[in-house]
Amino acid sequence: MLTFSGRDYLPTQMVPADVHIEDVAHALSLICRFGGHTEVHYSVAQHSLLVARILEERAAPVEAQLAGLLHDAHEAYIGDIPTPIKRALGAAWGDLEADVATAVRRALDVTFAFHDWEDLIKHADVVALATERRDLMHFDADRNLPWRILGGVAPFHQKIGALGWSPQWWADVFLDRYDTLRSAREAARLPHAA
C-alpha cells in the first residue's frame, strides 16, 4: 500500500520504520468515525484530539496525553473499523490491528506510556465516545439499541465544536498538538539543573 507521503508499506508486515507522523495526521484527518454516520464529517484526528483534551483537563501526565492523542494512530494504516464489525471479523482482524498498533506505538515512542496509562486512556476514549454520540449522532434512548460500553459514563462537559474546518486544518492541529506534547515530554525527561 502507498501512504500520503509516497512510501510503501505492508499492513501484514508493518515495522516502525514504515511509520511517519505526517502520514498519520493526514490519514486520520480524512478517516471518518462511525463509518461516516455522523451529522457532519468527523475524523479520527478530531476524536484523537478530544481524547488528549479530556486527559489534559483531568491533569493526566504529558506522556498519557501524548499516548491518548496517538491511541488510534494505527488506524492511519488500516482504517477505522466500527467495533461491531471488528467483532464480526474476529481474531484475524484483532491480530492484524494489534500488530500494526504495536509497530506504530514503537515508532512514535509511546509503547510504555500507552501501557502505563492504558486504563486512563481507555476511559478518556469512552468519554469521547459518549460525547460524540451526544453531539454528532441522532441517538434516541427510546428508539436505538443501548451502547453498553457507555453504561454510567458521562460525556465531556464541553460540546464538540469547530466542525466546519477542512481535513488539512485538522491534520495541522493534530501535528501541532503532537509536537507540543512531544516537546513537553522530552523537557520532562531532561535532568534538571541543581
Predicted regions span which residues?
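Metal-dependent phosphohydrolase cores
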Residues: 1-194
